[in-house]
């Protein structure tokens, strides 16, 4: 986080972020290593210059080449032996002043262009200000805090940004930068993902202010890139064509649409002009093949004639197309009609894939990138040694020193809470390493199921009647043991086919069987039926549904059935377990509501779809039952637009459920990046207050607002081998860190609340941005850890508190409610939901939950 990027818009001083209330002391100490490396920075001032490059809007890569060439070219007159560092946009830093007038200096820079033509750039350099690293030392040691007005200055004058640019300058020239990571093309290894994509490995690097020092956070990182290959091969991969020569016919419409979707927006280079490898961006794929696709060609005598692409290539380049029956790529601007046959194009190397990966690609990616904690630790250490920062001439220029051993940190393993079950003997479960067992225990409050139905959307061949019968018998046995008795056989059990049959069947059930509590739906693998079941059940008719994959019906296991019962009991109003009351923190002594909030955005490149905001609120004192609210809002908008009305609904609902008004509101907010802290806090805190005042003028409960972050690159490792847990050698569940690698004076901490099963555990990062309730560090860390044990869908502690997790589920479910049957396939992992042309009212209505479902945990 930039030093002090919090506070509020206009840096209103009343919105300064709470200072750390002290350090946590609870739990058993554990020695850890963090992938943070100390950077020693001199107490000096550096010089910031503004760089203006014309023509504007060049990619950063080009800007860097321009600046690099400029430094070489004007070495004698301006730069001498200085080694400036540059951020790829507007900011250039030097350790010594440059001999340029205060009005700035204009320079001409030439880069070799394509086809022997030079490209000329005009560069203006102008001094802006000194950036002080003295101040940085004062802040890091906690001797001074930035003045709130400092926070509104441009990022370039921020001393942390300057440190970041110095350490990023050389890698940005050497590798392909993506966000805060660097990648290089795979040499000597090959990790295809299918569909023309492959895995590139690289590293993440970012600078963070920590206690007493600056830290460089380094992590191994992987992402999907498009494979550099002929477009014909790319097409074959995307369309699963094994041999292009066996495809003598033009592409079918559905194939062409699929191919267009994948290649649109990618850069290709041509191969038919010798060494002139001109690059183009694809804007479309033609409907007609190269043998029929025409364009107006101007002859030398000024006459214009229609030519097909195939004819033109034969006449102009003496090139007989091998695949004239395949379509052409339309490149450049759509109105210009530039067509290229597929066979003369290659995919340009180094293009990152921002489109969503398919399920298969995602699982291949996870397999290729998951590393056990000790392996990852070793890999990061190797990376830092080979990066050899201290020999980087730019790091030397600014007199930095980067330590090459990981930061040693003392963490604490918090005690796990005990969980109260029900039944006659009211047993208590004590988690061990984040896991506990329900065998021999009964739900705290089990529901009795008297009337239920089964709808099987798998075929009779996939799931025979006796298999169904076996499944229901097993389910009834397990549910009885768990204290959720399912009485008798289902009142209805029928086979059906396809999403179109869901609504008529459910309507029939609702009208025929009064008091029907549950429909169990059996699905044949990945299918649009799921989205339709949830749309009809959650939004249209208000019926509880539980989907089961056919493979889990054919081959049942007690574990799967038990997990089904966890979900069913909660959907029907039961309570699986509660935190043992006497060990909960003191915040529970008065009525308190826990809110979780999340905004999910449409996949990249999908500009038309809305973002979805979800807020859930606890409805009892345990807290175990939650109620959901959900809204659609403008795409990519991070602030929850309608938060005041959502919180108001939840407060009213809490009052109806408990007959109390909460005196405290604990708000866990997921999915905010550090650059947005101030903006989101300012808007949302006021919205929560507004919700309270709208209910009663004098109603002012204490609000605690916490951001939960999972998407960061801090990893923690056990320093002592003996403390490693499980097959992947991770840190134990409950590991907490609030010193050394955390903020110099703001209230943040890392907590790894789950047991890592695969790969390296990622601790969640909690940032308390507002706290009227004056929590101590211990109280708040323990509360957060306990809430990670209240997630109803499994008997494990999860990686973020239950309310934040539920908000995520609610938003994700709303994506399914938005699937528009006419236009969307809801296929693959792409729940698409552009409600093509549906207006905002229609979208808002589509995610509205039926009043019978509203008060249930339908999302469980």
From Swiss-Prot:
Tagged with keyword Cytoplasm: yes
All residue ranges annotated as the Piwi domain in the record: 518-819
Gene name tied to this protein: ago3
GO BP annotations, alphabetical order: miRNA-mediated gene silencing by inhibition of translation; mRNA catabolic process; pre-miRNA processing; regulation of stem cell proliferation; regulatory ncRNA-mediated post-transcriptional gene silencing
Organism: Danio rerio (Zebrafish)
Family assignment from sequence similarity: Belongs to the argonaute family. Ago subfamily.
Top-level taxon of the source organism: Eukaryota
Designated name of the protein: Protein argonaute-3
Keyword terms: Cytoplasm, Endonuclease, Hydrolase, Metal-binding, Nuclease, Ribonucleoprotein, RNA-binding, RNA-mediated gene silencing, Translation regulation
